[in-house]
Curated annotation (Swiss-Prot):
Reaction catalysed by this enzyme: citrate = D-threo-isocitrate
Cofactor: [4Fe-4S] cluster
Protein family (similarity comment): Belongs to the aconitase/IPM isomerase family.
Residues annotated for substrate binding in this entry: 106, 199-201, 481, 486, 613, 676-677
Protein name: Aconitate hydratase, mitochondrial
Role of this protein: Catalyzes the isomerization of citrate to isocitrate via cis-aconitate, a step in the citric acid cycle.
Keyword Cell wall biogenesis/degradation recorded: no
Disulfide bonding pattern of the chain: none
Binding of [4Fe-4S] cluster, residues: 392, 455, 458
Gene Ontology MF terms: 4 iron, 4 sulfur cluster binding; aconitate hydratase activity; metal ion binding
Naturally occurring in which organism (per UniProt): Schizosaccharomyces pombe (strain 972 / ATCC 24843) (Fission yeast)
Length: 789
């Protein structure tokens, strides 16, 4: 059988694999006091040490309390509990109070995180924090030119971030350094650690055995301010890998297959933990790829258990001391025999095919053997316009080496790309190493364009000129997301996510029907030839070339203030939101009843809007402009109930707010899936929103809404969504007795004058989160607590 799924709770021992792995380390007996060793967390933070002793001590307490076997991810999470003695621990129910080891922020989300941290009045961050400049570089002409233009265009933001980093003791990675997740893997991730990052693909570090979780900026501020971080205790989905990858099948195909099985919401509230003998055929960066795209199934995070490939990668990236220490510590966090998984999926790597997922959603999985048929059946555009490789998901040395091996075959046959072909190295280190070893030159000779070490087209930073907006076309990428209009702001672009290998092979045909496993191309002499499977080393044989030094350590110079021009269009100091007035909410308008898929890209678009991520007033002009209005089936066209005119969503919201009228947004399933951007929660709060009421939420967005003092609520009866008219007026009752587990009531006053009716609204607020709501936001609550002290 290709794959096996166990839907019911199941038990499966993973001890055989973990024990054989541990034997391969020939590790020494575990020291009685692990903390006797002082091993630096990174080469940039010599005075910040890995705290394995805390994990060991916490686990001794937790295991006695729970008296059951623990999975690898559970051991890491519970090893970071703030209070292991009194913490309630029940999967899917409890809220864990955790102490992460570090925080990572990308430049688009760091602006708001730092602005919030500044409001908290703290002198410096309490844990190691880094900021990475990767989101604001637009891809257009090529790496150096695009980078130079970005440095000019974004100077105000970069100067703000660098100055703030110096003031608050934060590490700063300049533009051109690379993508945050590749930088973290190369320099900061370590087995057994707990990382939070203000980007949804933070789980990439799970490829190095770290629990790494994407969060909103307000969550990051908690940790930066030395407060425990709260996470609903996740369930654990086990994915057992057997067999071995070979030929055209790559690590990317593992997660593409898993996405097809679990869908975009199947991992919600769970950690996906990989294990089994098949893990041994994966490189460390390949494991990172799989964990990275776990965000597309809604998973809290994904992780692989510590294994020899991780040790090899740590040593290759100049972290031998961490590798030695992790090997010594490995037995403590190895998954226990008969550890319990809430669901188990089995995948045989021997029979796994390359996949292409899409269009318009990353969980529409099609094996390559059936893709030609799917193109015809669904009338997808057959011509391949552009192939793009790179992104935080697939931009490692191994990824690029395999792609280059395909390009070399094409060069040897005298052919060049028929589709536009772009290459994005994941980091300056990867770029420099690929340049030294010749792979980038090979890809250029084949017709490729090398872009800057940044996110680029993956997040919509792409000045595309080969098609007009609205023109139906197909692209293939090695990225992670393919929501409508995400890459190029063209809703008619059909984007398919696959491996760098398949992307590279397909650009030489220019045809979506081309299958490199079975089909041939014509060489320069008109003879048929077929590509051989790609080859590439997991690690460079000559070691990594670090390239240019793009890291800026926290300044020893005292920075007294972080200046923000009050007339700036890109940066704006925050004004605290008003606290709750102590009453139930009456006479609320329905701003928009959103129909169908509504991701954070629909709620708060990226691309050209990224430049306003530090200016709440300006970026609020993109609220819900991509969402489909259930009333008329159109985007960004709403009826203003005060004037009767049709306007943009933000303009209607502003009109209601300025007239003192609060409003709600209605949505359907998995509302807010995708990016961790907290702007999707800040904007409705700024514009006068009171609640977002849906059939279900994506994890990060639900938390972000709570953090900003909004009410994320779900229909107890999903059919109520269909019954409500967008022109009705609603009340939210029960807030005066707001309590965990106690539903609220939505009272609907129909616009047609018919009798009012009511429906129950569920919520997941705990006691502390209710205090956020009452204070007006989590940041307000933090400030209040600080004043009391």
């Amino acid at each position: 059988m290709f794959c096996k799924i166990s839907r019911a709770p199941a038990r499966m021992g993973s001890r055989i694999f973990t024990q054989s792995t541990l034997r391969s380390f020939s590790c020494a007996p575990v020291a009685a006091n692990i903390d006797a060793k002082k091993v630096a967390m990174s080469n940039f933070e010599k005075n910040k040490f890995i705290n394995y002793q805390r994990i060991k001590d916490n686990l001794e307490i937790v295991k006695k309390r729970l008296n059951r076997p623990l999975t690898y991810s559970e051991k890491i999470l519970y090893g970071h509990l703030d209070d292991p003695v009194n913490q309630d621990i029940e999967r899917g129910v409890s809220y864990l109070k955790l102490r992460p080891d570090r925080v990572a922020c990308q430049d688009a989300t760091a602006q708001m995180a730092i602005l919030q941290f500044m409001s908290a009045g703290m002198p410096e961050v309490a844990v190691p924090v880094t900021v990475h400049c990767d989101h604001l570089i637009e891809a257009y002409e090529g790496g150096p030119i695009d980078l130079e233009r970005a440095n000019v265009t974004n100077k105000e933001v970069y100067d703000f971030l660098q100055t703030a980093c110096a003031k608050y003791n934060i590490g700063f990675w300049r533009p051109g350094s690379g993508i945050i997740h590749q930088i973290v893997l190369e320099n900061y991730a370590f087995p057994g650690g707990l990382l939070i990052g203000t980007d949804s693909h933070t789980p990439n570090a799970g490829g190095l055995g770290m629990v790494a979780i994407g969060v909103g900026g307000a969550d990051a501020v908690d940790v930066m301010a030395n407060l425990p971080w709260e996470l609903k205790c996740p369930k654990v989905i086990g994915v057992k890998l057997t067999g071995q990858l070979k030929g055209w099948t790559s690590p990317k195909d593992v997660i593409l297959k898993v996405a097809g099985i679990l869908t975009v919401k199947g991992g919600t509230g769970a950690i996906v933990e990989y294990f089994g003998p098949g893990v041994e055929s994966l490189s460390c960066t390949g494991m990172g790829t799989i964990c990275n795209m776990g965000a597309e199934i809604g998973a809290t995070t994904s992780i692989f258990p510590f294994n020899p490939r991780m040790s090899e990668y740590l040593r290759a990236t100049n972290r031998s001391a961490i590798a030695d220490y992790a090997e010594e510590f490995a037995p403590i966090i190895a998954a226990d025999e008969n550890a319990h998984y809430d669901q188990i999926i089995e995948i045989d790597l021997n029979t796994l095919e390359p996949h292409l997922n899409g269009p318009f959603t990353p969980d529409l999985a099609t094996p390559i053997s059936k893709f030609k048929e799917a193109v015809k059946k669904n009338d997808w555009p057959q011509e391949l316009k552009v192939g793009l490789i790179g992104s935080c998901t697939n931009s490692s040395y191994e990824d690029m080496s395999r792609a280059a091996s395909i390009c070399q075959q094409a060069i040897d046959k005298g052919i060049k790309t028929k589709s536009l072909f772009t290459i994005t190295p994941g980091s300056e280190q990867v770029r420099a190493t690929l340049t030294r070893d010749g792979q980038l030159d090979t890809m250029r000779k084949a017709g490729g364009i090398v872009l800057a070490n940044a996110c680029g087209p993956c997040i919509g930073q792409w000045k595309r000129t080969d098609v007009k907006k609205g023109e139906k076309n197909s692209i293939v990428t090695s990225y992670n997301r393919n929501f409508t209009g995400r890459n190029d702001a063209n809703p008619a672009t059909h984007a398919f996510v696959t491996s760098p290998d398949i992307v590279t092979a397909m650009v030489f045909s220019g045809d979506m029907n081309f299958n490199p496993l079975t089909d041939t191309l014509k060489d320069k002499d008109g003879n048929d030839f077929k590509f051989e499977p790609p080859t590439g080393a997991g690690l460079p044989s000559k070691g990594y070339d670090p390239g240019s030094n793009t890291y800026v350590a926290p300044s020893s110079v005292n920075v007294k203030d972080v200046a923000i021009d009050p007339h700036s269009k890109r940066l704006q100091r925050l004004t605290p939101f008003k606290k709750w007035d102590g009453k139930d909410m009456k006479g609320l308008k329905i701003l928009i009843k959103a129909k169908g898929k509504c991701t954070t890209d629909h709620i708060s678009a990226a691309g050209p809007w990224l430049k306003y991520r530090g200016h709440l007033q300006n970026i609020s002009n993109n609220y819900m402009i991509g969402a489909i209005n259930a009333e008329n089936g159109e985007a960004n066209k709403l009826k203003d109930q005060l004037t009767g005119e049709y306007k943009t969503v933000p303009n209607v919201a502003i009109d209601y707010r300025d007239h003192g009228i609060r409003w709600v947004t209605l949505g359907e399933q998995n509302f807010g899936e995708g990016s961790s951007r907290e702007h999707a929660a800040l904007e409705p709060r700024y514009l006068g929103g009171a609640a977002v009421i849906t059939k279900s939420f994506a994890r990060i967005h639900e938390t972000n809404l709570k953090k900003q003092g909004l009410l994320p609520l779900t229909f107890a009866d999903p059919a109520a969504y269909d019954k409500i008219s967008p022109f009705d007026t609603v009340d939210i009752d029960g807030l005066t007795t707001f309590a965990p587990g106690k539903p609220l009531t939505l009272v609907v006053h129909p616009a047609d004058g018919s009798a009012e009716w009511s429906t129950k609204l569920n919520h997941t607020f705990n006691k502390d989160q209710i205090e956020w709501f009452k204070a007006g936001s989590a940041l307000n609550h933090m400030a209040n607590m600080h004043k009391q002290k």
